[in-house]
Amino acid sequence: MDRSGSSDFAGAAATTGRSNPAPWSDDKESPNNEDDSNEDDGDHTTPAKVTDPLAPKLANNERILVVSVTERTRETWGQKAEFLLAVIGFAVDLGNVWRFPYICYQNGGGAFLVPYCLFLIFGGLPLFYMELALGQFHRCGCLSIWKRICPALKGVGYAICLIDIYMGMYYNTIIGWAVYYLFASFTSKLPWTSCDNPWNTENCMQVTSENFTELATSPAKEFFERKVLESYKGNGLDFMGPVKPTLALCVFGVFVLVYFSLWKGVRSAGKVVWVTALAPYVVLIILLVRGVSLPGADEGIKYYLTPEWHKLKNSKVWIDAASQIFFSLGPGFGTLLALSSYNKFNNNCYRDALITSSINCLTSFLAGFVIFSVLGYMAYVQKTSIDKVGLEGPGLVFIVYPEAIATMSGSVFWSIIFFLMLITLGLDSTFGGLEAMITALCDEYPRVIGRRRELFVLLLLAFIFLCALPTMTYGGVVLVNFLNVYGPGLAILFVVFVEAAGVFWFYGVDRFSSDVEQMLGSKPGLFWRICWTYISPVFLLTIFIFSIMGYKEMLGEEYYYPDWSYQVGWAVTCSSVLCIPMYIIYKFFFASKGGCRQRLQESFQPEDNCGSVVPGQQGTSV
């Protein structure tokens, strides 16, 4: 699929040290060296016209770059839709289903949408757009990109990779829970519909019973805690117990699915996302139609949407809105950089940012209707108020919703499609997080890793699976929540703040805007430049400060964490955060030469031999 003829060398291009030079001019190979018939870069055997703003400028004493076809190309998405589905699939995750509806009704219902939309426009969307543009322009992952922006901040890339490992350790376990439920649903009677099972206790009681009290536990709750997790056999972090084999097998199956989706890069992932990104929407619509037809659904939806304007006076509402937008869109995890790096150079990433971020937020809103229609139904069945039915987090989708499904006709069918939806939502997000790390390391170490992607992905997933084994123990559910807070929860906020500062303050908004102009033909408007320079960094710093102040609240109140666990948690957080200052020290004192001024220049200015990755101007210096 050679686009430039059958010759081994497509031609030659000349460039100066600063005029769009080769991205791998330090003799590294392109990590994705397969030809790609889908990228229409034109025939580069003929020199570009001088009037072309992307054309290399010819001058005396320039070194000649021989552009090899295999080194000039980078694998691209088979279709534009594959990229959009991959981004949507990453952004729309389990949190859209179990977190947004809860914090929406908790923080004023319809009134919550005011700060939510404001933070989307002024905070989340500018960062989302930034990462898509950066990845598409520089066409590399979160490690290699920093030599073209601010070399001293390469530690941001290592921090992101470490955070992605922490996420892989617990997030796939949550998907494993859904897999367990899925297999348990293939029966004539759902196992959480009655209290006559071996794992039930004497406190078990049907939620529809008139004798149901606060001391009683529902069959669905006992199934989750005593059958799926068997958490009663452990004692939290103090004694987690052995690994539960059936749960470990479910999580292992998740890792197998992830491997065969990622081992070939965007060629394999691009095909998988057609199922994993679209299936949740089909199921959501089916569940919505079923939910609104249930008795009491209208009360649930009314509870969800009724605005309580007085709550907007509470600062917590605004902080929750900012946090939800940030973690929902997912900037800073390296995923948007990685996925957009496989786009064509002139792809309209601005339009993509608007489309995908809007779909993400609308999906959260739609999920609220699905959840609250069922919560209204459960309140009707139990003859109680909705606020006594709902739970936040995993309990909502693994206890309350299965509880509701068990009371419906055709409960087996509804259970199967619901947990299939959770699995596909989770898989898309874990694809994105792991692909960010894989792309980054393949780009940074192309000779060692890039050539052996299949083997590297296998070893990486095996390593993460082994590290995740403690989350599959009897006390693993506590560790899952612990890692969620201390792994990415706090660290990613600081990391993204430094990333934004590096791009907008060191690299410069003007230079970044010029990069966007090369791709799209026009510079970003004043609104975007103001957001990038001032509003977005303040947005990130504010969330980070308030998250540190309320980190114990993030852990929840269902389990009392021992004192030593807080020290371990902060060590986990610092392990990724410290990558940034440690690399700055390394770059300044050990990887730079000359006096203090020259070292600062080498550390905080883009390297001379690294510039924009313009199609047809990549190659190996000779």
Curated annotation (Swiss-Prot):
Question: For this chain's UniProt record, which GO biological process terms are given?
Answer: amino acid transport; monoamine transport; serotonin transport; serotonin uptake; sodium ion transmembrane transport
Main location group: membrane
Official protein name in the record: Sodium-dependent serotonin transporter
Anything further noted? This protein is the target of psychomotor stimulants such as amphetamines or cocaine.
Tell me which parts of the chain lie in the Cytoplasmic compartment: 1-82, 587-622
- Regions of compositional bias (Acidic residues) in chain numbering: 32-42
Query: What is the originating organism of this protein?
Result: Drosophila melanogaster (Fruit fly)
Q: List the disulfide bonds.
A: C195-C204
